[in-house]
Amino acid sequence: MTEKPRIFIVSDSIGETAQYVVDATVSQFNGYLDSKRFSYVQTTRELNNIIKKATEQKTLIAYTLIDPRLREEIATLARKNNIYAVDIMGPMMEAFEEFFQKKPRLQPGLVHRLDKDYFKRVEAMEFTVKYDDSNDDRGVKEADVVLIGVSRTSKTPMCIYLSYRGYKAANIPLVPEVEPTPLIYENPDNKVIGLTIDPLLLNEIRQERLKSLGIDPESSYASIDRINVELEYAEKTMEKIGCPVIDVTNKSIEESANEVIDYLNG
């Protein structure tokens, strides 16, 4: 059995709640783990199949199962097979039941009911994917927020986080050789926000990125001289726009994104 660890996410609904908790936790360990999501799990047979797959490789199971019988079943199966399993929602539901003296509805997927806010988030996510790393005027015009910055300043993950919160987020890379759309200098509705980062940290991030792609980490893209040129260009561009600037150095995606939200709600 290979020892490369991975995570199974098991849910009787979509599994977004468990996925979000897992992603937030993984980010605290500065690493990446393979994960596989099993959605709409409703039967013991499905649980048995998942457990069987989990035994083939070092696996941690994180689950959100509303049905107490399924929660008990997966916990039992995991113990029998020496698999580490984490119940994300069960303890909270039990605490609520005891504290409020009320029985839960035990209906999977209630948090994702098709209401106005849900459709707003879906629309925002679709928008963000469409205008990721884009220099398109339409993205600037239609976005709730436009993030600008040099490569590897967390523009894309921040936009994804913002879209999950219902904001149409676009991002534009700043590269000295490519002039951004003139529309950002007009900064309509004060929606443009700049991102910056410590050059030495950016150097490390870019080198790691190149290594992961099998490219020489000493290439010009990751050189400190090139990084300083890009950051200087980005700083001048942001000054010309007159937009707020967020330093993302050593900050989590959530922390930086919430600073963006604070600016938007200013």
Curated annotation (Swiss-Prot):
A Pfam family recorded for this sequence: Kinase-PPPase
Task: Locate the residues binding ADP.
Answer: 149-156
Q: Which InterPro entries match?
A: Kinase-pyrophosphorylase (IPR005177), PPDK_reg (IPR026565)
Which EC class is the enzyme in?
A: transferase
What keywords would UniProt list here?
Kinase, Nucleotide-binding, Serine/threonine-protein kinase, Transferase
- Which reaction is recorded as catalysed by this protein? N(tele)-phospho-L-histidyl/L-threonyl-[pyruvate, phosphate dikinase] + ADP = N(tele)-phospho-L-histidyl/O-phospho-L-threonyl-[pyruvate, phosphate dikinase] + AMP + H(+); N(tele)-phospho-L-histidyl/O-phospho-L-threonyl-[pyruvate, phosphate dikinase] + phosphate + H(+) = N(tele)-phospho-L-histidyl/L-threonyl-[pyruvate, phosphate dikinase] + diphosphate
Q: Which residues form a coiled coil?
A: none
GO MF terms here are:
ADP binding; ATP binding; phosphotransferase activity, phosphate group as acceptor; protein serine/threonine kinase activity
Reply yes or no: does the keyword Kinase apply.
Answer: yes
Q: Is Transcription tagged as a keyword?
A: no
Q: Give the EC number.
A: 2.7.11.32, 2.7.4.27
Family per similarity comment: Belongs to the pyruvate, phosphate/water dikinase regulatory protein family. PDRP subfamily.
| Cited function | Bifunctional serine/threonine kinase and phosphorylase involved in the regulation of the pyruvate, phosphate dikinase (PPDK) by catalyzing its phosphorylation/dephosphorylation.
NCBIfam families per record = PRK05339.1
Specify the protein name.
Putative pyruvate, phosphate dikinase regulatory protein
